[in-house]
Amino acid sequence: MMFEYEEDEDPMEQQKHEEFKHHSTDHSGSPQENPFRFSYDTGKRAASMFVTPSSEDLIAYGTKHLLDSPTAVQRSLVLNATTSLNIDCDLSSDDDLSPTTQRKICFCASQNPAETQEQGLRPAKSTLAISFPCHQHQITEDYTISAEIIGIGESGKVMACYQKVTGEKFALKVLRDSQKARREVELHWLTNAHENVVSILDIYENTFDNVKCLLMVVEFLEGGDLLSQFESQGSIPYTEKKVGEIIRQIGNAVMYLHDMNIAHRDIKLENILCSGTGDNCVYKLGDYGFAKRPERNVLMESPCCTPFYAPPEVLGRERYDKSCDMWSLGVAMYILLCGYPPFYSMKGVALSPGMRSRIANAYYAFPHEEWDCVSKDTKDDIRCLLRTNPSDRLTIHELMATPLVTGEPIVPGKHITTAIAIPGADESECGGGVFDDGFIVEEEETPDTVAEILPVPKSVRFLRDGVKAPRLHSIQEEVGRAMEIMRMGTDQVYIKNPTASCNNLFERRRAVHLSIPRVYC
């Protein structure tokens, strides 16, 4: 993914920052110490706090002295910690902010974002109200802030902090105060009591360098995020039992959110945090940067998502509901069971037109090399989650009742069974028994997905001794799917001009063709 940063700052805003460069004040006007000060000599700490100089003094000292001062470094750190990150894939982060505003770093908290068309149709909202418990005193009175960056969320950086009384380590998320930031904190606070949601310890409202910030202290999970764990062990697919346990825990959190009419809208492996790495690991849902709680029976329309996990209705900029989370859960299950995503970009960008088309039409498959060991029940669960029609997808309550999540044994003969006859191959090679007719289907497959196994014509069934049918099917499946994609998105098929293609084979054939005179009968 690519992130855009805007380095230029308005001259008037820059002058305003310079006037507050060494000091900040709270609501009562009393001076505050910036908690993001990391001086090497604690003995000089008191000397570093001084009265804000006048504009004339600033001009006299010059810009160079200001840039070299410790407070300039602190100010840069706190502003960087509240930097808004934007995915460069033509997707806005929320309906409360315009796309132009999202692509810029806001250097002044008092700067108002441009009004979007959707905001213009709604009545103006009143002053932001605090709907969650919030401390007004300085966070440095209770915690020691570390320069360690734990991670980067959708709306800001996550830093390490330590409680002064106990020395216990926590995670600190710094958010520039805004309507969107307050909604994130509010929704996280409403659900943080759940055992599978990252819990909140304290919330502070502080002002640093005239920038009003919300600081959220949350529990620190030693295991990190699930994607990092998965990649650290080589992206080796998890067993169905382990995936079922992960989905059971995260599904409990999602069910808790959905019952409160809250859509997370950014479920992905990076936002699933782990208490450890062992079998007794507790998985928790975090990062509410995209979360939203619409009114009952009101659909959402802002395209908030991560491309790999985005459902068709979100990419198509249609109205959608909480079922978008179910699609994302299906993608997460797919990745954990095979090691790669069902939808991918072939051009090195976050969301290519071809990937968008594959998502919109649910073009994916279960290659035999990785999926032969996965049960039909689990594959069908993924099919039911990755349905293009949101109303046809499994709900979170239905998913929690599946054998994968409950751990119940699979009922024989309930799902599709297939088998191919290959002489000299035992049942373990074919994945089933041997039949003379070569292809048996006991039940129809999900209609809106690519067929898992295609019938093999007799003309190519026995190309050579010892060939394995699953691999043969996989090749045919890939070719067929590629042809379907070409027919579906013809604008992505580029035909070069033969005279300008610089193709060596074409040039040789053209030279031979020109050197041999044509004979007409």
Swiss-Prot record:
User: Phenotype when inactivated?
Assistant: Slight reduction in motility. Partially resistant to nicotine-induced paralysis; resistance is further increased in a mak-2 gk1110 mutant background. Normal localization of several components of the sarcomere including unc-52, unc-112, unc-95, atn-1,unc-89 and myo-3.
What the entry says about post-translational processing? Autophosphorylated in vitro.
Q: Which residues form the active site?
A: D266
UniProt-annotated stretches for the region Disordered: 1-36
Q: What is its EC number?
A: 2.7.11.1
Q: Where does ATP bind?
A: I150, G151, I152, G153, E154, S155, G156, K157, V158, K173
Catalysed reaction(s) here are: L-seryl-[protein] + ATP = O-phospho-L-seryl-[protein] + ADP + H(+); L-threonyl-[protein] + ATP = O-phospho-L-threonyl-[protein] + ADP + H(+)
Q: Where is the composition biased (Basic and acidic residues)?
A: 13-26
Q: Which GO terms describe its biological process?
A: adult locomotory behavior; behavioral response to nicotine; intracellular signal transduction; protein autophosphorylation; protein phosphorylation
Q: Where is the composition biased (Acidic residues)?
A: 1-12
In alphabetical order, the GO MF annotations are:
ATP binding; calcium-dependent protein serine/threonine kinase activity; calcium/calmodulin-dependent protein kinase activity; calmodulin binding; metal ion binding; mitogen-activated protein kinase binding; protein kinase activity; protein kinase binding
Its GO CC terms? Answer: A band; cytoplasm; nucleus
Q: Which InterPro entries match?
A: Kinase-like_dom_sf (IPR011009), MAPKAPK_C (IPR027442), Prot_kinase_dom (IPR000719), Protein_kinase_ATP_BS (IPR017441), Ser/Thr_kinase_AS (IPR008271)
Q: Which cofactor does it need?
A: Mg(2+)
Keywords, comma-separated and alphabetical: ATP-binding, Cytoplasm, Kinase, Magnesium, Metal-binding, Nucleotide-binding, Phosphoprotein, Serine/threonine-protein kinase, Transferase
The UniProt entry, under SMART domains, shows:
S_TKc
Give the UniProt subcellular location, in the record's own words: Cytoplasm, Myofibril, Sarcomere; Cytoplasm, Myofibril, Sarcomere, A band
Record bears the keyword Acetylation: no
Pfam families xrefs: Pkinase
Keyword Metal-binding applies: yes
Domain Protein kinase: start-end pairs: 144-405
Tissue expression, as annotated, is: Expressed in body wall muscles (at protein level). Expressed in intestine.
The protein's assembly and partners: May interact (via protein kinase domain) with unc-22 (via protein kinase and CRD domains).
Task of the protein: Serine/threonine-protein kinase which may play a role in body wall muscle contraction. May phosphorylate unc-22/twitchin.
Similarity field: Belongs to the protein kinase superfamily. CAMK Ser/Thr protein kinase family.
How is this protein named in the record? MAP kinase-activated protein kinase mak-1
Q: Which organism is it from?
A: Caenorhabditis elegans
Q: Tell me the organism's taxonomic lineage.
A: Eukaryota, Metazoa, Ecdysozoa, Nematoda, Chromadorea
